[in-house]
Design a protein with these regions (language model features):
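Surface-exposed aromatic
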Residues: 39-46
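Helix N-cap motif at beta-to-alpha junctions
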Residues: 47-52
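Long, contiguous binding/interaction regions
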Residues: 2-39, 53-77
Length: 77
């Protein structure tokens, strides 16, 4: 079973990579872009067959490694 996870900076946390991308896009004439937030995307293949158990396991992974809970949020898809 494949579980997908998106990790993004929390609202209010500075995102220097996102800001740099936004500024570069503006300089390339994409002037309508007012903000970019950069995050991480994970696809985790698990041998667990039960979706509920697999998502709970991936949630533990997010809390322990994949996301820095002080500055990042995560969403399991």
């Amino acid at each position: 079973m494949k579980i997908k996870v998106i990790v993004t900076p929390k609202n209010g946390v500075l995102d220097p990579q996102g800001k740099a991308i936004q500024q570069t896009l503006n300089s390339m004439n994409f002037i309508d872009v007012s903000e970019v937030r950069q995050g991480k995307y994970f696809e985790i293949e698990t041998e667990l067959k039960d979706e509920k158990d697999a998502k709970k396991n991936v949630e533990d992974m997010c809390k322990k490694l994949l996301a820095n809970l002080v500055i990042e949020d995560y969403k399991i898809l």
